[in-house]
């Protein structure tokens, strides 16, 4: 997934419009080291004992003699498990910002207490990972090959030899599916999810989904565009591969949808526009990528952006292309969009 391997697609581009953009097209050559799968964590609810088995979304079944406690996970997965009482100690992926604060993808975790094996793309300390003696590695996957997200292509084989891996697919499915998978993973690791905080969070998610459904039905004329900003390119996401957009669309949200021919260069994930052409698609609401590697709306200086009707109307809301897959963290994604649609003025 290096810049060289991505040819004309930049790394920023690959990350821009849905987490993995053209992993199908861009990373097909990467393949995947079909590493064994497994996932788990040590936790506040760690009363489980005995053998541990988990079948991941690659169809790979991981079997360990005991429930793992030395878990290493992609930071977003670790943050979701944390919400269920499973305290992952080792992470990789965007964990800390340049000033040392928690990245948006770290959720509620105390990042000062985490062992970080790599904080940016293509960075993963194999030596540090080996010394940690992991029992399992858990990540998401953005393609049909099961490529482990944020596990570098150059070192994936070495990493795979040190511990089995578990992959949670976030490719071409609705948000509810990976939510259910992480729930099952947490439960297998000893989390008590049948009552209390977790059960309540699930109910609140379901209520938020119903609110969004009603808002979309009441305001079918409101057009929503999902965007992501880089210095030279504005990415317009399609809805057919991203877990959040697929789900919102299923709930009835009226999205801007670039034609497949326009999304081809982006592996089917997005269309790239120059800032001069950022007004190509009329939109009443713009959802903007909230990840730290993208330019945030307040920092966009392009005049063409500032002239957009949705921007002038203050109808720009955040979007999390790589949502933390716990019900508690995904509920606000639904309520924020529902509220935006309910209050939106028809400006496009």
Task: Provide a role label for each language-model segment.
Residues 157-230, 323, 327-348:
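Extracytoplasmic substrate-binding proteins
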Residues 208-220, 229-236, 267-291:
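Ligand-binding pocket segment of bilobal, Venus flytrap-like solute-binding proteins
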Residues 57-58, 117-125, 265-274:
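Short helix-initiation/N-cap motifs at beta->coil->alpha
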Residues 161, 177-178, 274-348:
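Structured C-terminal subdomain patch of bacterial secreted/periplasmic proteins
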Residues 133-139, 283:
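Proline-aspartate-enriched helix->loop->beta-strand connector
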Residues 74-128, 132, 141-148:
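A short, structured surface patch at a secondary-structure boundary
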Residues 1-79, 193-227, 290-296, 340-348:
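Bacterial Sec-exported substrate-binding components of ABC uptake systems
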Residues 238-269:
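Alpha-helical, coiled-coil/dimerization segments enriched in small aliphatic residues
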């Amino acid at each position: 997934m290096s810049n060289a391997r991505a040819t004309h697609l930049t790394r920023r581009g690959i990350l821009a419009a849905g987490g993995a953009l053209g992993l199908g097209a861009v990373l097909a050559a990467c393949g995947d080291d079909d590493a064994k799968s497994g996932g788990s964590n040590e936790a506040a609810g760690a009363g489980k004992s005995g053998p541990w088995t988990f079948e991941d979304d690659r169809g790979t079944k991981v079997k360990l003699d005991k429930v793992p406690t030395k878990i290493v996970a992609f930071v977003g997965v670790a943050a979701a498990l944390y919400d269920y009482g499973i305290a992952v100690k080792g992470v990789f992926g965007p964990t800390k910002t340049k000033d040392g604060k928690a990245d948006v993808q770290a959720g509620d975790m105390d990042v000062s207490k985490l062992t970080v094996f790599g904080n940016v793309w293509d960075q993963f300390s194999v030596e540090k990972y080996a010394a940690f003696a992991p029992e399992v590695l858990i990540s998401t996957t953005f393609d049909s090959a099961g490529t482990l997200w944020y596990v570098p292509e150059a070192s994936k084989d070495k990493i795979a030899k040190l511990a089995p891996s578990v992959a949670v697919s976030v490719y071409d499915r609705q948000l509810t599916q990976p939510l259910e998978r992480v729930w099952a993973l947490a439960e297998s690791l000893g989390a008590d999810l049948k009552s209390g905080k977790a059960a309540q969070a699930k109910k609140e998610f379901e209520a938020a989904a119903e609110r969004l459904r009603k808002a979309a039905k009441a305001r079918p004329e409101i057009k929503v565009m999902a965007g992501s900003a880089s210095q030279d390119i504005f990415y317009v996401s399609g809805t057919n591969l991203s877990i959040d957009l697929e789900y919102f669309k299923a709930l009835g949200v009226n999205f801007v949808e670039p034609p497949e021919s326009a999304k081809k260069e982006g592996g089917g994930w997005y269309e790239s526009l120059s800032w001069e052409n950022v007004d190509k698609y009329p939109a009443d609401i713009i959802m903007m990528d909230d990840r730290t590697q993208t330019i945030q709306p307040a920092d966009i200086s392009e005049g063409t952006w500032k002239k957009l009707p949705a921007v002038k109307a203050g109808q720009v809301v955040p979007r999390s292309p790589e949502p933390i897959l716990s019900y508690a963290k995904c509920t606000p994604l639904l309520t924020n969009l529902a509220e935006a649609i309910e209050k939106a003025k028809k400006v496009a």
